[in-house]
Amino acid sequence: MLQQRTIKTITRAVGVGLHSGQRVELTLRPAQPDTGIVFRRVDLPEPVDIPISAEAVTDTRMASTIGTGGAKVHTVEHLMSAIAGLGLDNIYIDITAEEVPILDGSSASFVFLLQSAGIELQKAPKRFIRVIRPVEVREGEGQNLKWARFDPYHGFKLRFEIDFAHPAVDSTGQCVEFDMGEDNYTRDIARARTFGFTKDVEMLRSHGLALGGGMDNAIVMDDYKVLNSDGLRYDDEFAKHKILDAIGDLYLIGRPLLAAYSAFRSGHGMNNQLLRALLAQPDAWELVSFDSERQAPKGFAQPARAW
């Protein structure tokens, strides 16, 4: 039986929110089988649980936000990407503010945090959402076209193409492919940082956003070049960060996907639209588990791999 996973011990981190600039404490705790991933706002007068789901996503401007009632948690995608990348199914995430800390702008710090806590196999079958026919969402036409799509695949792979007219991006490659069974998430994807332009940062800060952003947690560019003194972590770091975001956004469906995801100029909003479009078509997917590791897609049966 391919088993569910949680973490072995409690682990903690402290940081600031990318947009709020607010100090936040994060506590990750083991959870029982079939709990799923549950964020808990422990700073509120009465703590509020927010289980992840496609329907729990309430805002996708600049980041993925989940919420229930009046309680929200912003910028969940990097942490969710790390959780998905390590194949974890059940975790409680206690948080003392309304935004997940940005840490270094990638998911690498979250991966380290989770691996430090240890991975524990649980006595319950891991359940997947398997895509059994294509599902696609599109917006715009011509130069404004963007789309995202699922196709059937015995595993989970992603292909993402970006389209930024900027010398630094053009020179590094605008398309990346990643296969969870063939490649190594922690080595190939996790260190890719979020990125932005100085002119956009100034505009965002004038609106009370990006208050916690800087060169310590983002790739920052002017009109011509990368301004970070240490340059890029990967040659194609921009497109790889979009893969990182997509892995986190798509895991908000609440279970690991068996599908080939491809996208052109997609973002948090379109990723969530794709999840909702999939769930709205019951004949396009099915829930599956695997009685033996030999039946399971390559990669999912392996223990979470370190750096």
Swiss-Prot record:
Pathway annotation: Glycolipid biosynthesis; lipid IV(A) biosynthesis; lipid IV(A) from (3R)-3-hydroxytetradecanoyl-[acyl-carrier-protein] and UDP-N-acetyl-alpha-D-glucosamine: step 2/6
GO molecular function: metal ion binding; UDP-3-O-acyl-N-acetylglucosamine deacetylase activity
InterPro entries: Ribosomal_Su5_D2-typ_SF (IPR020568), UDP-acyl_GlcNac_deAcase (IPR004463), UDP-acyl_GlcNac_deAcase_C (IPR011334), UDP-acyl_N-AcGlcN_deAcase_N (IPR015870)
Record field: catalytic activity: a UDP-3-O-[(3R)-3-hydroxyacyl]-N-acetyl-alpha-D-glucosamine + H2O = a UDP-3-O-[(3R)-3-hydroxyacyl]-alpha-D-glucosamine + acetate
Cofactor: Zn(2+)
Pfam family, one: LpxC
SUPFAM superfamilies: Ribosomal protein S5 domain 2-like
Positions annotated as active site in the UniProt record: H268 (proton donor)
NCBIfam families in the cross-refs: lpxC
Function: Catalyzes the hydrolysis of UDP-3-O-myristoyl-N-acetylglucosamine to form UDP-3-O-myristoylglucosamine and acetate, the committed step in lipid A biosynthesis.
Protein name, entry field: UDP-3-O-acyl-N-acetylglucosamine deacetylase
Species: Delftia acidovorans (strain DSM 14801 / SPH-1)
